[in-house]
Amino acid sequence: YTDTTMALSGINKRRLDKLGVSYHCLIRDPQVIEMAKEKGITRSMAAVEVAANDSRQKIFIIGNAPTALCKIIEMVNENQLETAAVIGVPVGFVEATESKQALYESNIPAIVALGRKGGSNLAAALINAVMYNMDIEKLGDEYGRHTKQ
């Protein structure tokens, strides 16, 4: 799950498909928009709540919305969300530094860029780098930078 369509756009879909991984950005989902209005929360927070209902393993890729990162941490701490990992690199001044520090200090498996810097492009690059270094034999060399001899 990504917090922005921009992050999702930068992720290698062919590789995700090859791995059998589904990918979603719920920020424009009508259910998310309605929930955000009803609860008076950000759409990013509502998207995390909706994603929590997915029983499959999840990785959250957050490059823009510190509120999404805060919601992930809160829900994990309250045993309302299970996530395999989080890439937490929201950019900005408001809550970005604090949310990333909180993720860093949590027990959630994560890649975090501490401080103000980050962004959707970095989030996409990080998940792509993780995928590029996965089992190349399973993926086939046409999807990776490496070729096993």
Task: Give residue ranges: language-model regions.
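Short, well-ordered, mixed-charge alpha-helical segments that flank or form enzyme active sites
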Residues: 8-10, 32-34, 68-71, 93-96, ...
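Short, acidic/small-residue loops that bind anionic groups at enzyme active sites
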Residues: 22-30, 81-97, 108-115
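Buried hydrophobic positions in well-ordered alpha/beta secondary-structure cores of metabolic enzymes
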Residues: 3, 87-88, 126
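Long, charge-patterned amphipathic alpha-helical coiled-coil/hairpin "stalk" segments used as oligomerization
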Residues: 42-99
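Short, solvent-exposed amphipathic alpha-helical segments in soluble enzyme
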Residues: 14-19, 74-81, 101-105, 127-131
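Glycine-rich, small/polar surface segments that engage phosphate groups of diverse ligands
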Residues: 2-46
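C-terminal functional extensions of proteins
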Residues: 94-149
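Structural signal for hydrophobic packing residues in well-ordered secondary-structure cores
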Residues: 8, 27, 55, 76, ...
